[in-house]
Curated annotation (Swiss-Prot):
Keywords: Acetylation, Actin-binding, Calcium, Cell junction, Cytoplasm, Cytoskeleton, Metal-binding, Nucleus, Phosphoprotein, Protein transport, Repeat, Transport. This is Alpha-actinin-4. Residues 16-29 have a biased composition (Gly residues). Residues 50-154, 163-269 form the Calponin-homology (CH) domain. The modification Phosphoserine is found at residues 696, 909. Residues 1-269 are annotated as: Actin-binding.
Length: 911
C-alpha cells in the first residue's frame, strides 16, 4: 500500500510529467466521455460545487477510513498524490507503483501521474485533467477527477437490462421505488428534493428501519435528514449530502446525488443477488413439480386403461357356445354395444395418453431432465401390446359369434326338417306292423289271396319308396350330432326307434311274402284293373306326398342367386303339374273302368280296392292339397325374393359408401405422411395447415356415421358377406382411428418442435436445415432414422463420429441421449432436441447449487428457516421435505444438504 506518511524527504525539482493519462479501450472511454458533462472552460455553480465537495469528500472518506485515514479539504489533501494513490488502492483492491519520496513539486506531479495512469489503465479517458492542475489545487479539476473515479469504480458496473451505468442506476431506482406513492424518479436532481425517494429505497430493502406512511411530501428537510441518518446509522453509508442545500437549490447537483445513490445500490446488491438466486430456484422447482404432476397423471391413466383391457380380454375370449340362437344374438348385441359405447372412449384415452407421454418427454428434454421411465408394465409399448391383444381377441370373438349364429341357424333348420320327416314316416308306419302280422290269408279265397299278394307287392313298392326318407332321417340325425345339437339325445333316440322299426318292417314284409307265395298257387283270379290302379296309384300318391313335403319344406337363403334357384326349381315343378294331372286322370279312369265292369257284370265288390289303400278320394284330396300349397309356396318364395332384393340393395348401398370412404381414408393417410416429411413453410404455418387438415378430417365424420348406420341395417338383416366391396366396417373403423391418431400425433410433433425452437432459440432456417438433413437420410420416409442413417446424418452436419474407437464412443454417447429407451430408432423430435442442446445453453445442477449457496450465505448447507425466508411457502416446503440432512463436519442443527438435492433434480443422483 502507498506510504502516504513518507512525505518528509527533500524533493528535487525537475520537468513536469503531467498531462492526460493514456490507455483504455475506445468503448470505455466513449462511455466515460458521455457521462462526463463538465464544462472545463467555465467555473462550477457555487451551490453545485458545495454539494460536490461535501458529497465527494464523504465518499472518499468512506473508503479511506478502511486504510485508517481521511481527508478534510478535497482540493488540498490530494495535491501530493499520496492519499489519491491510497484511495485508488482501497477501491480497486490492487497495488499501485511505489510513490516517490520527496516534497518537491516534481515528486508530487509524478505521484499524481501514477494515479492518473492507473485510472487510464482501467479504460478511462481523462479529458483535460493533468497532474499540474491537481498539484496546484485546481478545485474544478480535482472534483472532475474524483467524479471520474466514482464513475469508474462505483457506477460503471451497474447495469440493468444492458443499459449504461447512469441509465442502469436510474432504472434500478425507478423499479425499487415504483410501488411507493408520491415517488416518481425521472432524474438525479429534482426527483430527490423531497427526500421520499431516499426513504423509499431504504424501506424497500429494510422496511423495519423506515415508517414510510408517516412521511409527508411537504416536509422535505425532515424526510432527507431521516434518510441520511438511517443510512449512516444502520447501512454504514456516510452522510454525503446536506438536506438544506438540496432543498434550497433549484436543481441539486446530479453527480452528488448519483454518488450518494450508488452507495445505496452497492449496499443492497447482496439482497438483489439473493432475489435472483431465489427466482432461479423457484423456476427450477416449478418445472420439476409440473413434470412430477404430468408423470402422476400418466401413471394413473395408464393404470386405468390397462385395467380396463385386463377386464375386457377375458370377456372377449369367452367361447362357451349357447343352446339357442336367441342367446347368441344377445351376445352379438352385447358385442355391438361394446363396439359403439365402451371402446371409442378408450381409443381416445389411448391416443391422449401417447400425446401426454410425448409432451412430457419433450418438456423433460427441454428442461435438461432425465427421460421419464414409467413403472414396470406401464410403458407405451406395454399399452400397445395389451391393445393389440385386445384387438386380436375382439376380432376372434366377432368371427366366433357369427359362426355360432350360422351353426345354430343350420341346427334349427335341420332339427325342424328332422321332425317333419320323422312325423311323416311315423304316420306312414303307423299300423304297418299289425298289417304285416295279420293272418288273413288263412281264411281268404283264391281271389282274396291274389289280392293280398298284389297288395303286398304294392306295399313293398311303397316300402322301397320310403327307403330314401329313412336314409335322410338318419343323415340329418348324424349331422345334428356332428354340429353338437343341444337336444341330440332325443333326436338319436327317435332316429334309433325309426331305424329299428324299419328293420322290423323289412323282416315282417319278407315273412308275409313267403306266406302269401306259399298259398299263391291256390289263387288264380285277380282283378287286373285294381292291380293296375294300385300299381299306378301308389307311386302317384308317394309323389304327391313328396311334393307336399317339398312345398312345405323350410328354406334358408342368403343371396339373390339362391332364391332365384329355388324359384326356378319351383317353376320347373309347376311345369310338371299338367303331366301329373293327366296321370291322376288316368288313375281315376282305371278305377272308374273297374266300377263300370263290376256294375255291367253285376259283380259285388267289397267297396275298397283290395290291392291298395289309396282311394280316389285320397288322391283327389292330396291333389287339392298340392294345388293349395303351390300358391302358398309362390308367395313364400316371392317374399323371400323381395327380402333378398332388399338385402342386395343394402349390400350395394354399403359398398358404394365404403368404396368412397375407404380410398378417402387411405388418401388422407398418405397425404399426412407426405406433409410430415415435406413440412414446407414455418412451423406455425405447418401447425395451422395441419389443424385445418384435422378439421377437414373431423368434418368427414358424418360419412363414417352414415356407414355405421348402413352397417347396422346389414347386421340386423343378418347379412354376412358382400361381394361388392373389399372393405369391412371393422377395417374402416381401424383406418379411421389410425387416421385420427396419426393427424393428432403429427400435430403434437410440430407443437413439440415449436416448443423446442422457442425454448432453445432455434431459427426457422436452422429448423429447415435440420428437417432437410433428416429427410435426406430417412430413405423409407418412416419418420425415424436407424443408427447408421443417424450417424450419416451427424457426419453430414460436421460431427466427428467416424468409424474409429473415439468416434464410436462419441456416437454411443449421442445414441444414449437421443434413444434412451434403446428402441433402435431416432425420431425427428429427438434429433431436434439433440441439435438444440448442442447449440444452446441450459440450466445445470451446478447453477442451482450456486444459487442455493447464495441463499445459504456461502455455507455448505442450508437451514429450513433460510429456505422459508427466501422461497415461496409451497416451494420452500417442497425442498425441506426432499432435502437430506447435511452430514459434513461443519454441520449445524437442522442443516440440510442442498447439493445432493440439486443433482437429483437433474437425474445425477436419487432424491
Amino acid at each position: 500500500m502507498v506510504d502516504y506518511h513518507a512525505a518528509n524527504q527533500a524533493y528535487q525539482y525537475g520537468p513536469s510529467s503531467g498531462g492526460n493519462g493514456t490507455g483504455g479501450g475506445g468503448g470505455m472511454g466513449d462511455y466515460m466521455a458521455q457521462e462526463d458533462d463538465w464544462d472545463r472552460d467555465l467555473l462550477l455553480d457555487p451551490a453545485w460545487e458545495k454539494q460536490q465537495r461535501k458529497t465527494f469528500t464523504a465518499w472518499c472518506n468512506s473508503h479511506l477510513r478502511k486504510a485508517g485515514t481521511q481527508i478534510e479539504n478535497i482540493d488540498e489533501d490530494f495535491r501530493d498524490g499520496l492519499k489519491l494513490m491510497l484511495l485508488l488502492e482501497v477501491i480497486s483492491g490492487e497495488r499501485l507503483p511505489k510513490p516517490e519520496r520527496g516534497k518537491m513539486r516534481v515528486h508530487k506531479i509524478n505521484n499524481v501521474n501514477k494515479a492518473l495512469d492507473f485510472i487510464a489503465s482501467k479504460g478511462v479517458k481523462l479529458v483535460s485533467i493533468g497532474a499540474e492542475e491537481i498539484v496546484d489545487g485546481n478545485a474544478k479539476m480535482t472534483l472532475g477527477m474524483i467524479w471520474t473515479i466514482i464513475l469508474r469504480f462505483a457506477i460503471q458496473d451497474i447495469s440493468v437490462e444492458e443499459t449504461s451505468a447512469k441509465e442502469g442506476l436510474l432504472l434500478w431506482c425507478q423499479r425499487k421505488t415504483a410501488p411507493y406513492k408520491n415517488v416518481n424518479v425521472q432524474n438525479f436532481h429534482i426527483s430527490w428534493k423531497d427526500g421520499l425517494a431516499f426513504n423509499a429505497l431504504i424501506h424497500r430493502h429494510r422496511p423495519e428501519l423506515i415508517e414510510y406512511d408517516k412521511l409527508r411530501k411537504d416536509d422535505p428537510v425532515t424526510n432527507l435528514n431521516n434518510a441520511f441518518e438511517v443510512a449512516e446509522k444502520y447501512l454504514d453509508i456516510p452522510k454525503m449530502l446536506d438536506a438544506e442545500d438540496i432543498v434550497n437549490t433549484a436543481r441539486p447537483d446530479e453527480k452528488a446525488i448519483m454518488t450518494y445513490v450508488s452507495s445505496f445500490y452497492h449496499a443492497f446488491s447482496g439482497a438483489q443477488k439473493a432475489e435472483t438466486a431465489a427466482n432461479r430456484i423457484c423456476k427450477v422447482l416449478a418445472v420439476n413439480q409440473e413434470n412430477e404432476h404430468l408423470m402422476e397423471d400418466y401413471e394413473r391413466l395408464a393404470s386405468d386403461l390397462l385395467e380396463w383391457i385386463r377386464r375386457t380380454i377375458p370377456w372377449l375370449e369367452d367361447r362357451v357356445p349357447q343352446k339357442t340362437i336367441q342367446e347368441m344374438q344377445q351376445k352379438l348385441e352385447d358385442f355391438r354395444d361394446y363396439r359403439r359405447v365402451h371402446k371409442p372412449p378408450k381409443v381416445q384415452e389411448k391416443c391422449q395418453l401417447e400425446i401426454n407421454f410425448n409432451t412430457l418427454q419433450t418438456k423433460l428434454r427441454l428442461s435438461n431432465r432425465p427421460a421419464f421411465m414409467p413403472s414396470e408394465g406401464r410403458m407405451v409399448s406395454d399399452i400397445n401390446n395389451g391393445w393389440q391383444h385386445l384387438e386380436q381377441a375382439e376380432k376372434g370373438y366377432e368371427e366366433w359369434l357369427l359362426n355360432e349364429i350360422r351353426r345354430l341357424e343350420r341346427l334349427d333348420h335341420l332339427a325342424e326338417k328332422f321332425r317333419q320327416k320323422a312325423s311323416i314316416h311315423e304316420a306312414w308306419t303307423d299300423g304297418k306292423e299289425a298289417m304285416l302280422k295279420h293272418r288273413d290269408y288263412e281264411t281268404a279265397t283264391l281271389s282274396d289271396i291274389k289280392a293280398l299278394i298284389r297288395k303286398h307287392e304294392a306295399f313293398e313298392s311303397d316300402l322301397a319308396a320310403h327307403q330314401d326318407r329313412v336314409e335322410q332321417i338318419a343323415a340329418i340325425a348324424q349331422e345334428l350330432n356332428e354340429l353338437d345339437y343341444y337336444d341330440s339325445h332325443n333326436v338319436n333316440t327317435r332316429c334309433q326307434k325309426i331305424c329299428d322299426q324299419w328293420d322290423n318292417l323289412g323282416s315282417l314284409t319278407h315273412s308275409r311274402r313267403e306266406a302269401l307265395e306259399k298259398t299263391e298257387k291256390q289263387l288264380e283270379t285277380i282283378d287286373q284293373l285294381h292291380l293296375e290302379y294300385a300299381k299306378r296309384a301308389a307311386p302317384f300318391n308317394n309323389w304327391m306326398e313328396s311334393a307336399m313335403e317339398d312345398l312345405q319344406d323350410m328354406f334358408i337363403v342368403h343371396t339373390i342367386e339362391e332364391i332365384e334357384g329355388l324359384i326356378s326349381a319351383h317353376d320347373q315343378f309347376k311345369s310338371t303339374l299338367p303331366d301329373a294331372d293327366r296321370e291322376r286322370e288316368a288313375i281315376l279312369a282305371i278305377h272308374k273302368e273297374a266300377q263300370r265292369i263290376a256294375e255291367s257284370n253285376h259283380i259285388k265288390l267289397s267297396g275298397s280296392n283290395p290291392y291298395t289303400s289309396v282311394t280316389p278320394q285320397i288322391i283327389n284330396s292330396k291333389w287339392e292339397k298340392v294345388q293349395q300349397l303351390v300358391p302358398k309356396r309362390d308367395h313364400a318364395l316371392l317374399e323371400e325374393q323381395s327380402k333378398q332384393q332388399s338385402n342386395e340393395h343394402l349390400r350395394r348401398q354399403f359398398a358404394s359408401q365404403a368404396n368412397m370412404v375407404g380410398p378417402w381414408i387411405q388418401t388422407k393417410m398418405e397425404e399426412i405422411g407426405r406433409i410430415s416429411i415435406e413440412m414446407n413453410g414455418t412451423l406455425e404455418d405447418q401447425l395451422s395447415h395441419l389443424k385445418q387438415y384435422e378439421r377437414s378430417i373431423v368434418d368427414y365424420k358424418p360419412n363414417l356415421d352414415l356407414l355405421e348406420q348402413q352397417h347396422q341395417l346389414i347386421q340386423e338383416a343378418l347379412i354376412f358377406d358382400n361381394k361388392h366391396t373389399n372393405y369391412t366396417m371393422e377395417h374402416l373403423r381401424v383406418g379411421w382411428e389410425q387416421l385420427l391418431t396419426t393427424i393428432a400425433r403429427t400435430i403434437n410433433e410440430v407443437e413439440n418442435q415449436i416448443l423446442t425452437r422457442d425454448a432453445k432459440g432455434i431459427s426457422q432456417e436452422q429448423m429447415q436445415e435440420f428437417r432437410a438433413s433428416f429427410n435426406h437420410f430417412d430413405k423409407d420416409h418412416g419418420g425415424a432414422l436407424g443408427p447408421e442413417e443417424f450417424k450419416a446424418c451427424l457426419i453430414s452436419l460436421g460431427y466427428d463420429v467416424e468409424n474409429d474407437r473415439q468416434g464410436d464412443a462419441e456416437f454411443n454417447r449421442i445414441m444414449s441421449v437421443v434413444d434412451p429407451n434403446h428402441s433402435g430408432l431416432v425420431t425427428f423430435q429427438a434429433f431436434i432436441d439433440f441439435m438444440s442442446r448442442e447449440t444452446t445453453d441450459t440450466d445445470t445442477a451446478d447453477q442451482v447449487i450456486a444459487s442455493f449457496k447464495v441463499l445459504a450465505g456461502d455455507k455448505n448447507f442450508i437451514t429450513a428457516e433460510e429456505l422459508r425466508r427466501e422461497l415461496p411457502p409451497d416451494q420452500a416446503e417442497y425442498c425441506i421435505a426432499r432435502m437430506a440432512p447435511y452430514q459434513g463436519p461443519d454441520a449445524a442443527p437442522g442443516a440440510l444438504d442442498y447439493k445432493s438435492f440439486s443433482t437429483a433434480l437433474y437425474g445425477e443422483s436419487d432424491l
